[in-house]
């Protein structure tokens, strides 16, 4: 009886642990989405920089996660490598927009941030 109870507890902790992990990825996606809206609407350099900085942190954190669609894949699988590569692209695009924002080029930074949507759409089709 005791072994059965321990086995049930171990399995349930794994199940609930992965659900929490998926929520972290979802939270990061929400942060990216919410701040992309700020980037699109703002004309304020400080607000733009803050939104891009939050997006960068969320992208780096999300890159460490495994999307539900890839839970059965090994961490070094081609699919997981491609998933992470998508975040490398995204972070590079955010860095480019952030550089422009830091130079005071708000319009150019916002235009550069448009590429974020293309990257998002491409990788959502694959892994969402």
UniProtKB/Swiss-Prot annotation:
Cofactor descriptive note: Binds 1 heme b (iron(II)-protoporphyrin IX) group per molecule.
One Pfam annotation reads: Cytochrom_B562
Highest rank taxon of the organism: Bacteria
Q: What are the GO MF terms of this UniProt record?
A: electron transfer activity; heme binding; iron ion binding
- Residues at which heme b binds: 29, 124
Q: Does the keyword Transport apply?
A: yes
Family per record: Belongs to the cytochrome b562 family.
Q: Which InterPro entries does the annotation name? A: Cyt_b562, Cyt_c/b562
Keywords (A to Z) from UniProt: Electron transport, Heme, Iron, Metal-binding, Periplasm, Signal, Transport
Which lineage do the record's taxonomy fields give for this organism? Bacteria, Pseudomonadati, Pseudomonadota, Gammaproteobacteria, Enterobacterales
Name listed for the protein in its UniProt record: Soluble cytochrome b562
| Swiss-Prot/TrEMBL GO biological process terms | electron transport chain
Q: Where in the cell is it found?
A: Periplasm
Task: Please give the function described in this protein's UniProt entry.
Answer: Electron-transport protein of unknown function.
Asked if Transport is a keyword of the record, the answer is yes
Q: Where is the signal peptide?
A: 1-22
Cofactor(s) demanded:
heme b
Q: Which GO terms of the cellular component aspect does the record hold? A: periplasmic space
UniProt organism field: Salmonella typhimurium (strain LT2 / SGSC1412 / ATCC 700720)
């Amino acid at each position: 009886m005791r072994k059965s109870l321990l086995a049930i507890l171990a399995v349930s902790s794994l199940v609930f642990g992965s659900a929490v992990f998926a929520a972290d990825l979802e939270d990061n996606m929400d942060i990216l989405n919410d701040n992309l809206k700020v980037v699109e609407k703002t004309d304020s350099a400080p607000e733009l920089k803050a939104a891009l900085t939050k997006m960068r942190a969320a992208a780096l954190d999300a890159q460490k996660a495994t999307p539900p669609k890839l839970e059965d894949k090994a961490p070094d699988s081609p699919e997981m490598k491609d998933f992470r590569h998508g975040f490398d692209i995204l972070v590079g695009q955010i860095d480019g927009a952030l550089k422009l924002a830091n130079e005071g080029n708000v319009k150019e930074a916002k235009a550069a941030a448009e590429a974020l949507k293309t990257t998002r759409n491409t990788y959502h089709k694959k892994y969402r």
